[in-house]
C-alpha cells in the first residue's frame, strides 16, 4: 500500500505496547474467535476499542473485519448479542446504501461469513449491507468502515482455517462441510476478487491520503 505496516496480536495483553498513535496513517482490526466484549479473558480487546474510538474521533481511517467490525461498533455504542444461529459459509447479503468502496457491488452479493455474534448499528452510523440473519453486515461512521463478512480470504487462508480443528467443528455445527465450503469458494472467489480489491485498495488510498497530513 506504499506505507510501512505493523501487524500485532494484542488480545492477551492488558497494556499492549502499541505504536505511537499520532504516527499511524490507519488502523485495521481483524477477526478472532473471542467475543468483542470478552475483556476479562482478553484484556487487549479494551485497548482495541479505545484505539477505535480515538481513530474515529481524529478522522483516522479504520477498518474492522468480523470481530474487528464488532469491536468498532461496540466501541461506538452499538449493542452486541448472540446471533439467532451461527452464520458460517457463503450466503447472500443485500446492499442497503452505496459507499464509494462498494460502487461496483450488485444489490445482492454472496460472500463468506464466519461468526456467531451480531452487533447493532452505532448511533449516526450509515448501514451499508445486511442479511436475513444479521441486520448489520457493513456500516460506516466517519472514518470507520466495518464489515462482518470476509472479503480478505484467499485460497491459502481458507486452507489454514480448514486445518484448524475448532473452526472445522464450528463449520460442522452450522451444518457445513469442508468439501462444500471449498466448492463454494471456487464458485464465488473470482466474482469477489475485484470487489475485495476495490474495498482494500480504497482503504489503503485513504490511509495514504491521511499519511500526507502527518507530514505537515
What are these model-predicted stretches?
Residues 3-63:
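Flexible gly/pro-rich beta->alpha loop and the following alpha-helix that scaffold active-site loops
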Residues 55-79:
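Catalytic nucleophile loop
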Residues 34-35, 69, 118:
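Glycine-rich nucleotide phosphate-binding loop and flanking beta-alpha elements
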Residues 43-47, 80-81, 129-130, 163-165:
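Glycine-rich, phosphate-binding/catalytic loops in enzymes
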Residues 49-53, 102, 200:
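Short amphipathic alpha-helical segments and helix-helix/interface helices
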Residues 76-157:
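Pocket-forming structural segment of enzyme catalytic cores
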Residues 153-216:
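Acyltransferase
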Amino acid at each position: 500500500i506504499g506505507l510501512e505496516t505493523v501487524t500485532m496480536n494484542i488480545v492477551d495483553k492488558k497494556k499492549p505496547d502499541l505504536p505511537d498513535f499520532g504516527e499511524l496513517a490507519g488502523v485495521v482490526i481483524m477477526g478472532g474467535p473471542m467475543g468483542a466484549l470478552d475483556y476479562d479473558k482478553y484484556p487487549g480487546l479494551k485497548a482495541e476499542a479505545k484505539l477505535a474510538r480515538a481513530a474515529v474521533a481524529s478522522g483516522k481511517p479504520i477498518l474492522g473485519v468480523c470481530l474487528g467490525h464488532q469491536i468498532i461498533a461496540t466501541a461506538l455504542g452499538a449493542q452486541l448479542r448472540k446471533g439467532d444461529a451461527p452464520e458460517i459459509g457463503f450466503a447472500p447479503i443485500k446492499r442497503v446504501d452505496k459507499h464509494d468502496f462498494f460502487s461496483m457491488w450488485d444489490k445482492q452479493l454472496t460472500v463468506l461469513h464466519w461468526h456467531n455474534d451480531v452487533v447493532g448499528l452505532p448511533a449516526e452510523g450509515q448501514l451499508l449491507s445486511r442479511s436475513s440473519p444479521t441486520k448489520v453486515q457493513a456500516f460506516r461512521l466517519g472514518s470507520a468502515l466495518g464489515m462482518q463478512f470476509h472479503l480478505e480470504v484467499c485460497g491459502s487462508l481458507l486452507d489454514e482455517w480448514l486445518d484448524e480443528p475448532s473452526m472445522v467443528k464450528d463449520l460442522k455445527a452450522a451444518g457445513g462441510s469442508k468439501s462444500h465450503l471449498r466448492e463454494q469458494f471456487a464458485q464465488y472467489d473470482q466474482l469477489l476478487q475485484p470487489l475485495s480489491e476495490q474495498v482494500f485498495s480504497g482503504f489503503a488510498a485513504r490511509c495514504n491520503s491521511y499519511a500526507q497530513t502527518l507530514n505537515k
